[in-house]
A protein has these predicted regions:
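Outer-membrane beta-barrel pore proteins
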Residues: 1-6, 33-36
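Surface-exposed strand-loop-strand hairpins of Gram-negative outer-membrane beta-barrel proteins
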Residues: 3-20
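Outer-membrane beta-barrel porins/channels
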Residues: 25, 32-474
């Protein structure tokens, strides 16, 4: 059983986000039975927190004329979904004399189909600041600076059911069924200083759901007289079934805006399949006082499979309704362009100066999942974009983790204390820098292209974790 504290080393407290959070991380047990003179069969259950989302992100920088509402306006100027934008018109599903009609982004000037790249922020912008109240004309407004804060909370809980065994203390086999439980929440506020006004966006988001995966592995001692061992394992994708819900608001002091305030909420059910993971490990024990280990893992994040729930059927045998899904091919192609394979290296050592005391050291390196210039693409014709309520993103870099720990044994009772420090840098962008959403202003000889770029803002995710583990051997 393990628990402790997670402390964020940088950032400013915001909303319900805290820099120090208590965390219950693990509880489990193993039942072992002898199947031969030197062979055993083990049955285990383990709960552990696979991901802790508690984090506060703060960023502020100059914008030099670019703005989030300019991104929406530029997409509208492109005029059609095929060009990466949309055609803005009053809601065509309602009577023309209905004064409650909102502005919608359509796939073409004559279509009644909503463009899939007309996201929730585009909707809010065109029904407030991007539309002039007096004339109904559309405009974009420049900004000089931004301020951004987001508080993340929640976790992914892993419930692992394991069967393992060994053959003559030479070959060790194991298989694990993992059940995942997703609880993610975030709340963000984003403000821009316009030329003569201010604008703010608030977004509350929640993702819940579940998933499962399977892991199988083998460890072999090739030389009977040696403690040296070689291991290999493979982990299937985690097959997630998720629901994203949001409530997003906009407010501006721009006097020409169609409305000073707007709000939208949506729910999106989808499936998300993570990459396969492959690993190899080496280990060796020197006497009864020193243990050394090294592990290498590889996951290709460019193979992430985002899927659209597109129907379903009733399974009469199991008496339940089953959803069907298909790949979101446009989003998955974009994933291949911006993400890459991730390598993880784990090194560890344990030294016992006396029989019941252990000193442990560890180091982890995780390479970045993002290509150097990888970013969101708000022009994609994808349901993932249509339901998006966040324009910002962080291109996170490599992770370095350092661990030190002490373990003490009193008869059958074990006490372990550990400290881990994790450091990661990243580039924050309030919206995407994409030439495809640059637009032309003016006519004839005065025409010019006006890009909507934001400079990277350096951010960090540095955290310390203090962990206490208690164990008992029956």
């Amino acid at each position: 059983m393990s628990g402790g504290l997670v402390v964020q080393g940088n950032g400013t407290a915001f909303s319900n986000g805290k820099k120090t959070n208590a965390s219950f991380d693990q509880i489990g047990g193993v039942y072992s039975m002898r199947t031969g003179r030197t062979s055993y069969l083990n049955f285990g259950f383990n709960y552990h927190k696979g991901r802790n989302f508690d984090y506060i992100l703060n960023a502020a920088n100059a914008l030099n004329g670019s703005s989030l509402n300019n991104q929406s306006y530029a997409k509208g100027e492109l005029g059609s979904e095929g060009k990466g934008g949309y055609y803005v018109d009053l809601d065509r599903s309602k009577p023309q004399n209905d004064k409650r009609r909102d502005f919608i982004g359509y796939s073409t000037p004559t279509s009644t189909d909503n463009a899939l790249n007309f996201d929730q922020l585009d909707y809010l912008n065109f029904n407030t600041i991007n539309t002039e109240k007096a004339t109904g004309n559309h405009y974009g407004y420049n900004a000089s600076a931004f301020d951004f804060n987001r508080a993340y909370t929640g976790y992914i809980g892993n419930y692992d059911f394991n069967v393992s065994g060994n053959l003559n203390n030479r070959v060790y086999l194991g298989i694990t069924l993992g059940i995942k439980d997703v609880h993610y929440k975030s709340y963000s506020e984003y403000f821009e200083q316009l030329d003569n006004a201010q604008i703010g966006y608030a977004n509350e988001k929640e993702i819940t759901g579940n998933g499962f995966d399977i892991t199988a592995g083998i460890i072999v001692r090739p030389v009977e007289s040696s403690a040296f061992r070689i291991g290999a394992y493979v982990k299937s994708p985690t097959w997630y079934d998720l629901r994203a819900e949001n409530n997003t608001q906009i407010e501006t002091t721009e006097a020409r805006a169609l409305n000073p305030f707007g709000e939208i909420g949506n729910t999106y059910d989808y499936k998300f399949f993570t990459p396969w993971k492959f690993g190899i490990s080496l280990g060796h024990t020197v006497g009864n006082y020193l243990a050394l280990g090294a592990t290498y893992e590889y996951e290709d994040y460019s193979t992430i499979n985002s899927r659209i729930n597109d129907g379903g059927y009733y399974d009469w045998y199991y008496d339940e309704y089953r959803e069907t899904s298909s790949p979101d091919r446009i989003m998955n192609n974009h994933t291949k362009q911006v993400l890459r394979g991730v390598s993880t290296l784990k090194l560890g050592a344990e030294y016992k100066p006396v029989e019941n005391l252990a000193i442990r050291l560890g180091y982890n390196y995780v390479s970045s999942a993002y290509k150097e210039n990888g970013q969101k693409d708000p022009t994609l014709s994808s349901l993932g974009n249509a339901y998006s309520s966040e324009a910002d993103f962080v291109n996170w870099k490599d992770i370095n983790r350092f661990t030190v720990g002490l373990g003490y044994q009193i008869k059958k009772f074990n006490i372990d204390l550990a400290y881990q420090y994790s450091a990661q840098k990243g580039d924050f962008y309030p919206f995407s820098n994409l030439p495809a959403i640059s637009y032309t202003t003016g006519t004839g000889a005065t025409a010019k292209t006006t890009p909507n770029f934001a400079s990277a803002t350096k951010v960090e995710n540095n955290r310390s974790q203090f962990l206490l583990t208690l164990g008992y051997q029956f």
